[in-house]
UniProtKB/Swiss-Prot annotation:
Record carries keyword Cytoplasm: yes
Residues reported in the UniProt entry to bind a divalent metal cation: 5-6, 101
InterPro entries: RNase_HII (IPR022898), RNase_HII/HIII (IPR001352), RNase_HII/HIII_dom (IPR024567), RNaseH-like_sf (IPR012337), RNaseH_sf (IPR036397)
Main subcellular location: cytoplasm
A Pfam family annotated for this UniProt entry: RNase_HII
Annotated GO CC locations: cytoplasm; ribonuclease H2 complex
Gene: rnhB
PANTHER family: RIBONUCLEASE H2 SUBUNIT A, RIBONUCLEASE HII
Reactions performed catalytically: Endonucleolytic cleavage to 5'-phosphomonoester
EC number of the protein: 3.1.26.4
Name the UniProt record assigns to this protein: Ribonuclease HII
Gene3D superfamilies assigned to the protein according to its UniProt record, in alphabetical order: Ribonuclease H-like superfamily/Ribonuclease H (3.30.420.10)
Domain RNase H type-2: 1-190
Matching CDD domains: RNase_HII_bacteria_HII_like
Length: 190
């Protein structure tokens, strides 16, 4: 069985990233013992530790993303689904079942699926995927922060904090900002 989740859906900057994990049934209790839970409920340090440990407990995993041009072209919801589909397709063995975080199943994946609203809080498989996706995306955004100073990306990871919005108003959007997400911030400085 596999779980898949995405991160970065609400960010102003950077791609939406997804991870899929294929976990043997006998390893599920081990994930719980490790402290796997929704990535948003973990400190950055604990997330990183779990992301390093998870490959030893899962059969395999895949990480993928949808970039800003794709988000602009198809919308964030469809880009999130695309990133999750790509992550599942990167698994070397196709699972019998996929638990998908959210309200949608993956339209281009022909296998048994279940959409689980709030799945990152309800399923250890989805939680494990959320951890891998979050750490991968946070690492990417931290690296990109050096190329784009002035937006406080290393701290906000691309989300719309006050400092990030201030940077957008002061410097404008970079090519990795999501124009549809940033337009109102830039046009309406209040």
């Amino acid at each position: 069985m596999a779980g898949v989740d995405e991160v970065g859906r609400g960010a102003l900057f950077g791609p939406v990233v997804a991870a899929a994990v294929l976990v043997p049934i006998e390893a599920i209790n081990q994930l719980q013992a490790l402290g796997v839970k929704d990535s948003k409920q973990l400190s950055p340090q604990h997330r990183s530790q779990l992301a390093q440990a998870l490959p030893d407990y899962v059969h395999s995993y895949g990480i993928s993303f949808a970039d800003v041009p794709t988000i602009n072209r198809v919308n964030i919801r469809q880009a999130s689904l695309l990133a999750m589909e790509r992550a599942v397709q990167k698994l070397p063995v196709m699972p019998a079942w996929v638990l998908v975080d959210g309200r949608d199943t993956l339209p281009h994946i022909a296998m048994a699926q279940m959409a689980v609203t709030g799945g990152d809080r309800k399923s250890l498989l989805i939680s494990a995927a959320s951890i891998l996706a979050k750490v991968w995306r946070d690492t990417l955004i931290t690296r990109l922060a050096e190329r784009f100073p002035g937006y406080d990306l290393a701290s906000n990871k691309g989300y719309g904090t006050a400092k990030h919005r201030q940077g957008l108003r002061q410097y404008g959007a970079t090519p990795l900002h999501r124009p549809l997400f940033c337009r109102k911030i830039i046009e309406n400085p209040d």
